[in-house]
Amino acid sequence: MKVDPNKEKALAAVLSQIEKQFGKGSIMKLGEDRSMDVETISTGSLSLDVALGAGGLPMGRIVEIYGPESSGKTTLTLEVIAAAQREGKTCAFIDAEHALDPIYAKKLGVDIDNLLCSQPDTGEQALEICDALTRSGAVDVIIVDSVAALTPKAEIEGEIGDSHMGLAARMMSQAMRKLAGNLKQSNTLLIFINQIRMKIGVMFGNPETTTGGNALKFYASVRLDIRRTGAIKEGDEVVGNETRVKVVKNKVAAPFKQAEFQILYGQGINRTGELVDLGVAHKLIEKAGAWYSYKGDKIGQGRANAGKYLTENPAIAAEIDKTLRELLLSNPSALASSASDDDNVEGNIDLETGEVF
């Protein structure tokens, strides 16, 4: 197609003027954008990284994680912090709920000596701290726990029973407009944890909604719905939760995928158990009866012992993880097909055998 040389000359002149006024890179052709390959941070779960499509949560974006109480929201964000710190990144935790347990965080692999933590008095203060950390360019990951606890200053200074209609939604809307551009420029990942509320009078459709208005739903590049689907037992003792995460919104890859994994109390995401399950599903690990083998060598009798072997041999675990990651990220539908048989399974899981009861 022939291009008018006068138009080309005019376009070059206006692009030059815009770059001179607003800085280099303020406008460019989309194909010239070198940041198109999105940098990501692992969630701590291989199946969730694959379900997200890009291999983890995207840097420079806003992410919302929501679900019922005790579903694993804070645990998932602490796993993200631990993964980021292993890569040498700086992380901050804005604890609006004033409920962060440093001992539990340490058990999940978080370096609490280098984790920045703030317990703000008001919602405005929390969001201003987020903005200041973002603009500094020195912080890579910020967690806000939670949107429901970001109480506007007017509500705190008022009396219980006073009406404060729409204050939190207005505060969040202003913050989103301010933060979105700064996050992109500083390449900072901002994760909001949110709670679920019920809409009154809803007869048809889903009555659940999240707090803080609609602004966060629009500005978030990724929204994750996390649910507890069953209990994990060792004998009669409950030692963890079966967890399902649905990717409700995804601007960096295909949405609506889901991942299932285990969260063990005091340990976090059961990564080795996940490697065993996915390894068997994709023929990397052989299973004969109760015995599991990798490259011809037996690694354990029973799923728990195979997982224990991988925990004690991190080099082999890393090798399996790398192979699975390359296989599944190049063909995400393989994860869906391997999980299809279990999509409707809800109940209790025996940690040793992996059987549902």
UniProtKB/Swiss-Prot annotation:
GO BP annotation list: DNA recombination; DNA repair; SOS response
Main location: cytoplasm
Pfam families to which the protein is assigned, alphabetical: RecA, RecA_C
GO CC term, one of those recorded: cytoplasm
Matches recorded under PROSITE patterns: RECA_1 (PS00321), RECA_2 (PS50162), RECA_3 (PS50163)
UniProt xrefs under SUPFAM superfamilies: P-loop containing nucleoside triphosphate hydrolases, RecA protein, C-terminal domain
Similarity field: Belongs to the RecA family.
Protein name: Protein RecA
Organism: Shewanella oneidensis (strain ATCC 700550 / JCM 31522 / CIP 106686 / LMG 19005 / NCIMB 14063 / MR-1)
Encoding gene, per UniProt annotation: recA
